[in-house]
């Protein structure tokens, strides 16, 4: 008969809640294990079946570690600030606060229905003032150390949205969401100096157990490159110099022109009157493009000549100065030297605008395409005949000796744009006074509360909707000096950059978390989440953690020791699940129809955890069938334990049971859940064939299954006569000696042809094997009337008999 999943799952979820089964233990004599999920943004759509995949993976690890005797910290919370709630509020007139609260309650209900073993006493919410007090406190420490500053920054401004959007959110000059026009304009922004940590953010990746692809993405994002800064004097104005950064200063004899970013500070000064209109029109056109569009390698190169020239400081040659959108002011110095013969982008630019192509490294046909390989230098004066490394050293020395350049390290990474012109975010705790002074809100006055507001429409001035709240914005100090609060709010990344610390000590009113507790739990042993967070969230969290380490607030240099990315669950048509495609599967429906245990088992059995796999109703049915097989193996039609479950062991299952304990334990540790489940299926198949089921092995099976299917195993555990939860039952161990068969199979050959298979003791000697083979009835018949010339026995393998032909 089928087990009653709805009844059983509700019963045990109630039990866990009432008994606080998963409350974090902090026993000094136990080791600690911190299993962390990337906390979700609580959207209006609720959970989809992609969420439980990662959550179940960490839950399996947390449940196994509890049973192995660890203190386990396994928490959940909400990354609840953010644009979608604000957009919803603007569209409907509802409060983002109420909308978020409703969504959080729905997410919590759904997560609890999946049987995930979270310690709900440690729940955090980034919109809770008791939480964002510490987000604001971290900002204040960054400000005090000079790592938070204000700057006029060119940003992607969307007048319709009333906010800045990130480069990644601009496509063809319009916002990704809504298709609103975007313009580039300088705005006062708060910026965090993440570049101060660039080297450490790269170098410390080597010590982390993370997927290599993720580490490489972070290295590329930071983009450390070693090169030279070279000063090109402007022709006719020797006092004005343009600094260029190049990773290949050895190609300086092949420079055909200098290209500046349209935003470069010298563009106006360098543009001659006859080129003014053309340059201004070009700059206006570029203002509608994001940095990503500008640097797209596939697009046509564009540019305009300024009318001015520089002098090559090494060769003395006069070179034209152009501006082009593929050069970004935010990278390097905003000026590049164009070497058409040896750079594909420069080659395209030179061909389009008829610039000379001078080969300075031997190889290829540079008139047709750029040669980017290695070779000896030619047409390069004192560098001729040198290879790349020699030439770079030689030119760097020459530049320094002649005072026109120096060796330099450059980074692709830009400082972190930290302000948003929105309402639904953490207020930045800063006051701007009428006399020009800027001060922090005193620490003892934190949190600076986000005020309640009914009108959260964008201000239209480039400020956030908070600018409309006069009573909140305007302040007066004790001396009558007037000031205005900062009206920008923090980005959604802020609260998620440190939440893993708060779980360790979530109710501490005096500090982020007690240092001794942080020492006990950090770094996080296992962090599971989507690969789409490979760069920004993980980079920002590492930056804040390193800063807090420097302050002495946290005891480790890195927050997450091991990172695992779960794959994506696709629609049954192999496409990404989305509302617009109508292929989203709601976990509530699956839990209702099949049960949470089936959903958990199916998602872990679909394939490797990091693979992207299509959803299959058939696979779901198969998982449900297996759970019923386990139930019916042990429970009879009257809902009682079967008589086959006995304290007597006839040893039929010894080998397969011990193999199963070994393989499942090792596979869980390696997070190879699909192969662990396969092994459990093999054991269940063997158990069905056995005459009796030893109680010890039945209990072991139930324990091994419990991290994956916790509800049914709790029920089976109680049917086996245990009081209380299986959650802290001792994890099974295996007997190494039982993994080795006492009996092995050998073959008996006559003149090279196999004539018999014999079961023999694994320790049988040569003489014993020969005797067993020659006395076997079938072999005797084969040898009748034949002369045996030789008998060769190989222990554990074969007996070979040679007879006269």
UniProtKB/Swiss-Prot annotation:
One of its GO terms (cellular component) is cytosol. This is Leucine--tRNA ligase. One of its GO terms (molecular function) is aminoacyl-tRNA deacylase activity. It comes from Ligilactobacillus salivarius (strain UCC118) (Lactobacillus salivarius). InterPro entries: aa-tRNA-synth_I_CS, aa-tRNA-synth_Ia, Leu-tRNA-ligase, Leu_tRNA-synth_edit, M/V/L/I-tRNA-synth_anticd-bd, Methionyl/Leucyl_tRNA_Synth, Rossmann-like_a/b/a_fold, tRNAsynth_Ia_anticodon-bd. It is found in: Cytoplasm. Keywords: Aminoacyl-tRNA synthetase, ATP-binding, Cytoplasm, Ligase, Nucleotide-binding, Protein biosynthesis. It is an enzyme of class 6 (ligase). Pfam families: Anticodon_1 (PF08264), tRNA-synt_1 (PF00133), tRNA-synt_1_2 (PF13603), tRNA-synt_1g (PF09334). GO terms for biological process: leucyl-tRNA aminoacylation. Belongs to the class-I aminoacyl-tRNA synthetase family. ATP binds at residue 579. Its EC number is 6.1.1.4. It catalyses: tRNA(Leu) + L-leucine + ATP = L-leucyl-tRNA(Leu) + AMP + diphosphate. Transmembrane segments: none annotated. A motif ('HIGH' region) lies at residues 40-51. A motif ('KMSKS' region) lies at residues 576-580. The gene is leuS.
């Amino acid at each position: 008969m089928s087990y009653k999943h709805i009844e059983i799952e509700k019963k045990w979820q109630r039990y866990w809640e009432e008994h606080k089964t998963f409350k974090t233990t902090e026993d000094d004599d136990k080791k600690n294990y911190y299993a962390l999920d990337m906390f979700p943004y609580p959207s209006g759509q609720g959970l989809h079946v992609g969420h439980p995949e990662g959550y179940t993976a960490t839950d399996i690890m947390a449940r196994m570690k509890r049973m192995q005797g660890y203190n386990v910290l396994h928490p959940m919370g909400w990354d609840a600030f953010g644009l979608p709630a604000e957009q919803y509020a603007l569209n409907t007139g509802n409060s983002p606060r109420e909308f978020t609260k409703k969504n959080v309650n729905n997410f919590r209900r759904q997560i609890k229905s999946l049987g995930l073993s979270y310690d709900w006493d440690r729940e955090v919410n980034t919109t809770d003032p008791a939480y964002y007090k510490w987000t604001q406190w971290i900002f204040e420490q960054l400000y005090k150390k000079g790592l938070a500053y204000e700057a006029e920054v060119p940003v992607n401004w969307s007048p319709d949205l009333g906010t800045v959007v990130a480069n990644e959110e601009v496509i063809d000059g319009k916002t990704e969401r809504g298709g609103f026009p975007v313009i580039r304009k300088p705005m006062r922004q708060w910026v965090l100096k993440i570049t101060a940590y660039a080297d450490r953010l790269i170098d410390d990746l080597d010590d982390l157990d993370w997927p290599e692809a993720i580490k490489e993405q972070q290295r590329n994002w930071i983009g450390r490159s070693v090169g030279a800064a070279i000063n090109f004097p402007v022709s006719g104005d020797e006092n004005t110099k343009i600094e260029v950064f190049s990773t290949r200063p050895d190609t300086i004899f092949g420079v055909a022109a200098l290209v500046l970013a349209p935003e470069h500070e010298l563009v106006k000064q360098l543009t001659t009157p006859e080129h003014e209109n053309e340059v201004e029109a070009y700059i206006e056109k570029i203002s509608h493009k994001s940095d990503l569009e500008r640097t797209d390698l596939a697009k046509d190169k564009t540019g305009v000549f300024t009318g001015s020239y520089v002098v090559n400081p090494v060769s003395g040659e006069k070179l034209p100065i152009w501006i082009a959108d593929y050069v970004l002011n935010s990278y390097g110095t905003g000026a590049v030297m164009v070497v058409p013969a040896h750079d594909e982008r420069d080659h395209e630019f030179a061909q389009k605008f008829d610039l000379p192509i001078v080969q300075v490294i031997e190889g290829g046909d540079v008139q047709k395409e750029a040669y980017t390989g290695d070779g000896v230098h030619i047409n390069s004066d004192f560098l001729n005949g040198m290879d790349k490394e020699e030439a770079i050293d030689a030119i760097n020395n020459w530049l320094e000796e002649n005072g026109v350049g120096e060796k330099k390290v450059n980074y692709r990474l830009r400082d972190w744009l930290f302000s948003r012109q929105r309402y639904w975010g953490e207020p930045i705790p800063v006051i701007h006074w009428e006399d020009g002074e800027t001060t922090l809100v005193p620490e003892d006055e934190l949190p600076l509360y986000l005020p309640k507001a009914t009108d959260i429409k964008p201000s239209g001035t480039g400020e956030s909707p908070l600018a409309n709240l006069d009573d909140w914005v305007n302040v007066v100090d004790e001396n009558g000096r007037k000031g205005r609060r900062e009206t920008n709010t923090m980005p959604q990344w802020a609260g998620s950059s440190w939440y893993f610390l708060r779980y360790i000590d979530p109710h501490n009113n005096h500090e982020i978390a007690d240092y001794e507790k942080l020492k006990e739990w950090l770094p996080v042993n296992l962090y599971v989440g989507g690969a789409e967070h490979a760069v920004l969230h993980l980079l920002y969290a590492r930056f804040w953690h390193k800063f807090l380490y420097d302050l002495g607030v946290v005891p480790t240099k890195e927050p997450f020791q091991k990172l695992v990315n779960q794959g994506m669950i696709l629609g049954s048509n192999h496409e990404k699940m989305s509302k617009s495609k109508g292929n989203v599967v709601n976990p509530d429906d699956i839990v209702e129809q099949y049960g949470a245990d089936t959903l958990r088992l199916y998602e872990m059995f679909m394939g490797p955890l990091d693979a992207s796999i299509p959803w299959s109703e058939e696979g779901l049915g198969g998982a449900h069938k297996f759970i019923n097989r386990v139930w019916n193996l042990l429970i009879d039609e009257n809902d009682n334990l079967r008589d086959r479950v006995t304290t007597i062991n006839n040893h039929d299952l010894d080998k397969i049971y011990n193999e199963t304990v070994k393989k499942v334990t090792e596979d869980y540790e390696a997070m190879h859940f699909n192969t662990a489940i396969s092994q459990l299926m093999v054991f269940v198949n063997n158990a069905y064939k056995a005459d009796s089921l030893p109680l010890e092995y039945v209990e072991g099976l139930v324990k091994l299954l419990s991290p994956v299917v916790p509800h049914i195993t709790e029920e089976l555990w109680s049917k086996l006569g245990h009081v209380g939860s299986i959650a802290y039952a001792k994890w099974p161990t295996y007997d190494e000696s039982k993994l080795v068969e006492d009996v092995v199979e050998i073959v008996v050959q006559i003149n090279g042809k196999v004539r018999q298979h014999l079961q023999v003791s694994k320790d049988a000697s040569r003489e014993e094997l020969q005797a067993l083979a020659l006395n076997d009835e079938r072999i005797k018949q084969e040898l009748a009337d034949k002369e045996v010339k030789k008998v060769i026995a190989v222990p554990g393998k074969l007996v070979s008999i040679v007879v006269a032909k």
